[in-house]
Curated annotation (Swiss-Prot):
The lineage of its organism: Bacteria, Pseudomonadati, Pseudomonadota, Gammaproteobacteria, Enterobacterales. Its EC number is 7.1.1.-. It comes from Shigella boydii serotype 18 (strain CDC 3083-94 / BS512). In the N-terminal section; belongs to the complex I 30 kDa subunit family. In the C-terminal section; belongs to the complex I 49 kDa subunit family. This is NADH-quinone oxidoreductase subunit C/D. NDH-1 shuttles electrons from NADH, via FMN and iron-sulfur (Fe-S) centers, to quinones in the respiratory chain. The immediate electron acceptor for the enzyme in this species is believed to be ubiquinone. Couples the redox reaction to proton translocation (for every two electrons transferred, four hydrogen ions are translocated across the cytoplasmic membrane), and thus conserves the redox energy in a proton gradient.
Amino acid sequence: MVNNMTDLTAQEPAWQTRDHLDDPVIGELRNRFGPDAFTVQATRTGVPVVWIKREQLLEVGDFLKKLPKPYVMLFDLHGMDERLRTHREGLPAADFSVFYHLISIDRNRDIMLKVALAENDLHVPTFTKLFPNANWYERETWDLFGITFDGHPNLRRIMMPQTWKGHPLRKDYPARATEFSPFELTKAKQDLEMEALTFKPEEWGMKRGTENEDFMFLNLGPNHPSAHGAFRIVLQLDGEEIVDCVPDIGYHHRGAEKMGERQSWHSYIPYTDRIEYLGGCVNEMPYVLAVEKLAGITVPDRVNVIRVMLSELFRINSHLLYISTFIQDVGAMTPVFFAFTDRQKIYDLVEAITGFRMHPAWFRIGGVAHDLPRGWDRLLREFLDWMPKRLASYEKAALQNTILKGRSQGVAAYGAKEALEWGTTGAGLRATGIDFDVRKARPYSGYENFDFEIPVGGGVSDCYTRVMLKVEELRQSLRILEQCLNNMPEGPFKADHPLTTPPPKERTLQHIETLITHFLQVSWGPVMPANESFQMIEATKGINSYYLTSDGSTISYRTRIRTPSYAHLQQIPAAIRGSLVSDLIVYLGSIDFVMSDVDR
């Protein structure tokens, strides 16, 4: 069991600005590189943020990876356009910056490294030599910011089409369609686009056949039922055996992070539901918690429990779809229809509480949209009485089936080392024997007050183990819901804080000052203090996080969304090489991903 991250900060509110100079890793870095080798930034991220020189990057990364309790996972990597940022007191001069978020499982601690870059020299050495999963993150950072990673094995666009001009997350790049010239698809442009789609193996890092060997190249997707969305995998086959494969993503990209720079802190909430469109309120949780850190808001206990309750309902809802579609991918049709019957009961309950079903957009900065309705407890009790028996029937009728076991046991198997190298989280990581669930390791929204267990595998993560862990996670979510039902606190559903949005009625319409405040907050949105905040949660598919940068405005200066599905799809080639195409179908079904979560 990992140590609880809250030990060092148990007496401090989550939103306190800290430089984390007391974190042991800061001392280790200073002992190795000298006390003046870098700048420590005070933030509300909850992790040490260290600015280092570009020339030090690989040496510092290697040092952190080889510490006695090493930082073994590259959790996230991306960039920021710093040119319009006004609140940068005490930070190195930078037109752009790149950040590297590393996690140590043994310490249950993080560190964020930052590198400052000048606009006329947007080069930084590739991190893929230390962490293979840096590949996609560096491609995306180049695609959206134009930052070059020297030595990268295949630095090409990943979100945008190969013919795209410009880098969309730069501040001088238009954010609205009305800022572009009208689009016209001329014959010449159409021919250019078609030419760009011509498949050339060497552009994908694959080798062509020779006189002595020949391969078949096969497209799986982007329209294939087992691809679970607009997702393409280019397969290099020797007969039925997968010699190599390259996932091709970006078909579902909607510019969610760019939208965060146009919407107010409050009006961005509905967008979070649609990042991973099966998770509902689960996706709202990291965003509102990160904004509340910026605002300095501590919510009432009732809000915490309500948020946990809605999150676990959506976790069950998502897991039911995952388990049933996995069974369908293996070849059994009936369970998916049973699952949709059970999911309908959850949607009815969610609708009774929030007024909406799939995308409630119900969490608010400082609380929730409204209080629980009368009768919510009866509906939840009926569901809790119904679901355990149904779950047992899924397991007995389908998941213990010998054909399903034969198709999934030992398929696409990997160990803890591989999972950490590729940034795998959620059931895929825990199946390898690593007990890391954010709800336990780094409790948020009051999860530390609930009694539940974290299912963990025996050392190897294969398709069958991943699915069975999700089944047990369903049971644990039912335990949490039972406690929500029996121990729902009394109290307000919003925090009494000036930045709670929309503000409580008692803070509005009393006299001219409250009228003005209400008008500004509702029309323009609240003004968040200039700072940075970060929040990770245990989402339905793994760890989801929001890293927010405020420049003291009504909108976010930078909204970075790290999703689990993105990391999990990058791992596909490493896990499936040498297997059969039929094994790939089972593997895809066991990952639990949706393309909106990948492409954002």
